[in-house]
């Protein structure tokens, strides 16, 4: 690749001082926003898909969590290759796979085909969610790094909110209430975002690129760090909570009497409420307070779930807002802890991010599946509330240990 067109020479000018880092952040945000749109796009369409394909709640729960299952297998390898191939090509490839996953749902004829198409998202997804922190680690440092993490983390929340609000309100009416055509249009949008990334993104040439360490050696070294192991456990519980509750939230609200359109609006409240906290907290919480902050967010998450499941009216909306503020902040805080661990840094952030998302998405898969299975067994979502509270308490206990560890700056 020609330098200056698709790569950035670190020796000529540090990327952390280049104004182009903000261009990188902008297109990274856009790409991550469409990642969120792709992930959330199926939730507001659960009801027509269930009716059209004659699926059970358990089957739909398995579909909702299927991409996390493939993600688990792909993420560790994806992180290793992101470190090797660079961010420009890797994120472009991931975006193409996501566009295919969403667009091909148009052809789903039953449980099996839909499962395969949603699961394909887990092949491309790791390139985006792991490539994002890798990009920030390369292009930003100091307090700007916390700011950048907060900003790019709002991307999937904007994209997810757009999917929840616009799917039943805009796209479904425009497509004659065809969930198939809705997926097709979303796939085209993601493809256009991928092309924009390809034309504007820049890789960084560093002096460390010549070092070659085997993937097993890198992962073994990372797993020896206690702080990293704690982050992995917290990530496992966090993703189970976030993916489990948010995947089923529109249906939970429909069971409480909301129309599909109103349920989509209400389901976007946590996403929108979390955006201000993402823009502020990652920048201003000092590294030595991140463990305590995780504990506080875990308690707030557990409390908000009970408000959502057990109450109606204004207090339920309070629960949605508190859940958005608390749950949306967990992953950025864990990412910063991981990124600033001395054994990780920018050099191994791809591999460390792959390890983090590999473990975390086990929870991301089990969350929607277990909540769907609990509905089949109990006839309601209350049992899932007990599960979410238990996981939140697990985060509380584990996050308190992070404060005792030294976090590298």
What name fits each language-model region?
Residues 8-18, 202-231:
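Juxtamembrane intracellular "pre-TM" segments in multi-pass secondary transporters
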Residues 42-44, 226-278:
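Extracytoplasmic gate region of multi-pass secondary transporters
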Residues 344-380:
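A late C-terminal transmembrane helix in Major Facilitator Superfamily
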Residues 73-109:
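Conserved MFS/SLC helix-loop-helix module at the cytosolic interface between two early adjacent transmembrane helices
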Residues 151-201:
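Helix-loop-helix hairpin linking two adjacent transmembrane segments in secondary transporters
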Residues 117-155:
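Cytoplasmic helix-loop-helix junction between adjacent transmembrane helices
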Residues 40, 68-76, 161, 271-279, ...:
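Residue-level signature of mid-helix packing/kink "hotspots" within the transmembrane helices
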Residues 289-337:
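C-terminal transmembrane helical hairpin of 12-TM major facilitator-type secondary transporters
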